[in-house]
Curated annotation (Swiss-Prot):
Its EC number is 6.3.5.7. Allows the formation of correctly charged Gln-tRNA(Gln) through the transamidation of misacylated Glu-tRNA(Gln) in organisms which lack glutaminyl-tRNA synthetase. The reaction takes place in the presence of glutamine and ATP through an activated gamma-phospho-Glu-tRNA(Gln). InterPro entries: Amidase, Amidase_CS, Amidase_dom, AS_sf, GatA. One of its GO terms (biological process) is translation. Pfam families: Amidase. This is Glutamyl-tRNA(Gln) amidotransferase subunit A. GO terms for molecular function: ATP binding; glutaminyl-tRNA synthase (glutamine-hydrolyzing) activity. It catalyses: L-glutamyl-tRNA(Gln) + L-glutamine + ATP + H2O = L-glutaminyl-tRNA(Gln) + L-glutamate + ADP + phosphate + H(+). Keywords: ATP-binding, Ligase, Nucleotide-binding, Protein biosynthesis. Belongs to the amidase family. GatA subfamily. It comes from Staphylococcus aureus (strain JH9). Signal peptide: none annotated. Heterotrimer of A, B and C subunits. The gene is gatA.
Length: 485
């Protein structure tokens, strides 16, 4: 197998044993990008000069047996809404085209400390608003399994690059499913950690009470290794949680005999495709064969997740994106002749259609006379959804179900139908609304397109999610499939 498809864990061993140099790994990755990414279109910017320089410095440390860092010499790709000092960060928007940050996000500081090597920035839906990566101002990423299909979104570039062997791991952000859904569509592993597990400092805000950074990898253990590296409280993020336990790997191989798994009947109900239902039901049988106890439960407020999410997320986006006005931040219209025109034209020209749609929706929901009817009511529904999960977790360790109701749809199929696009978030948005951790792992294919299985856990219990996902992965994985892509 080419180095480009090696796991994080195997690469770490090869580097530690001096069977390969970090500079060789980085060269192989850039060769793969040059060969494959003109088709996949996952990267927006490459940091080749700095990456090669960093890898050569790591070569010298390797020669001296000074290989410090959990990710020593491991290449990484970063979603383009995560601030990278000195490297363009655009959120895939005309509004931020050419913006080069002068500070580092906390997750990037942590990854640099662990001696990972930044390869480049990855494509996404504009300002993380979308489920297909088609709202990007710059390019449309394709699904490595089927180039006619979308990779999902908003972290579509992050999922596609990992699936195509262009990086062993990437970071994405998840506000309503934006790590897990593309992970499902692209046949990789994607973790949305508990809200507060990972610092949001340096993540360009979409919806501050929902956003969370997480890793995408080709296997479960790699994912746990990366989350260990980026987790932890941060003085720069008041919503980050002071939780000391960031060990996700030591018990990952422990069996799941007796583990209680809840299967909500709503997760296999209306709107979920038959091929997805079949794959999930097969996965449930696999869990039972591994000794888990799987029982049907009800999460009755699941159906309100999408409307509640879109009101809350759009309202927060309306506020967060007000800073992009052409004066303090972002694109500056050259055609304006007055201050009022400057505000209007900069935002009208700088933002894409979907971003403007959500700003309008959020502004409306927060406006006088509608706040109580929409925003306040949505927050009440959010509490009901959280209460549903709390009740289930009194008796169960993990919730299981599909990640997305269908496999990846075709490029261009849903971009002009926002309500159909939003419906794809049916099974992921409740997890964000409740602030819970959720992981997507591959569980099947239909017509060559991957199907994702989602495990949802108790707050800050990513350890159990990794354990059950790892055990399931021993029975089903796509390791041999990636290289054929």
């Amino acid at each position: 197998m080419s180095i480009r498809y090696e796991s994080v864990e195997n690469l770490l061993t090869l580097i530690k044993d001096k069977k390969i140099k970090p500079s060789d790994v980085v060269k192989d990755i850039y060769d793969a990008i040059e060969e494959t990414d003109p088709t996949i279109k996952s990267f927006l910017a490459l940091d080749k000069e700095n990456a090669i320089k960093k890898a050569q410095e790591l070569d010298e440390l390797q020669a001296k047996d000074q290989m410090d860092g959990k990710l020593f010499g491991i290449p990484m790709g970063i979603k383009d809404n995560i601030i990278t000092n000195g490297l363009e960060t655009t959120c895939a928007s005309k509004m931020l085209e050419g913006f080069v940050p002068i500070y580092e996000s906390t997750v990037m500081e942590k990854l640099h400390k662990e001696n990972a090597v930044l390869i480049g920035k990855l494509n996404m839906d504009e300002f993380a608003m979308g489920g297909s990566t088609e709202t990007s101002y710059f390019k449309k990423t394709v699904n490595p399994f089927d180039h006619k299909a979308v990779p999902g979104g908003s972290s579509g570039g992050s999922a596609a690059a990992v699936a195509a062997g262009l990086v062993p791991f990437s970071l994405g952000s998840d506000t309503g499913g934006s790590i897990r859904q593309p992970a499902a569509y692209c046949g990789v592993v994607g973790m949305k950690p508990t809200y507060g597990r990972v610092s949001r400092f340096g993540l360009v805000a979409f919806a501050s009470s929902l956003d969370q950074i997480g890793p995408l990898t080709r296997n479960v253990k790699d994912n746990a290794i990366v989350l260990e590296a980026i987790s932890g409280a941060d003085v720069n993020d008041s919503t980050s949680a002071p939780v000391d336990d960031v060990d996700f790997t030591s018990e990952i191989g422990k069996d799941i005999k007796g583990l209680k798994v809840a299967l909500p009947k709503e997760y296999l109900g209306e709107g979920v495709a038959d091929d997805v239902k079949e794959a999930v039901q097969n996965a449930v049988e696999t869990l039972k064969s591994l000794g888990a106890v799987v029982e049907e439960v009800s999460l009755p407020n699941t159906k309100f997740g999408i409307p509640s999410y879109y009101v809350i997320a759009s309202s927060e986006a309306s506020s967060n994106l007000s800073r992009f006005d052409g004066i303090r931040y972002g694109y500056h219209s050259k055609e304006a002749h007055s201050l009022e025109e400057l505000y209007k034209m900069s935002r009208s020209e700088g933002f894409g259609k979907e971003v403007k749609r959500r700003i309008f929706l959020g502004t409306f929901a927060l406006s006088s006379g509608y706040y109580d009817a929409y925003y306040k009511k949505s927050q009440k529904v959010r509490t009901l959804i959280k209460n549903d999960f709390d009740k289930v977790f009194e008796n169960y360790d993990v919730v299981v179900g599909p990640t997305a109701p269908t496999t990846a749809f075709n490029l261009g199929e849903e971009i002009d139908d926002p309500l159909t696009m939003y419906a794809n978030d049916l099974l992921t948005t409740p997890v964000n609304l409740a602030g819970l951790p959720g992981i997507s792992v591959p569980c099947g294919q239909s017509n060559g397109r991957p199907i994702g299985l989602q495990f949802i856990g108790k707050p800050f219990d990513e350890k159990t999610l990794y354990r059950v996902a790892y055990q399931y992965e021993t029975q089903y994985n796509l390791h041999d499939v990636y290289e054929k892509l």
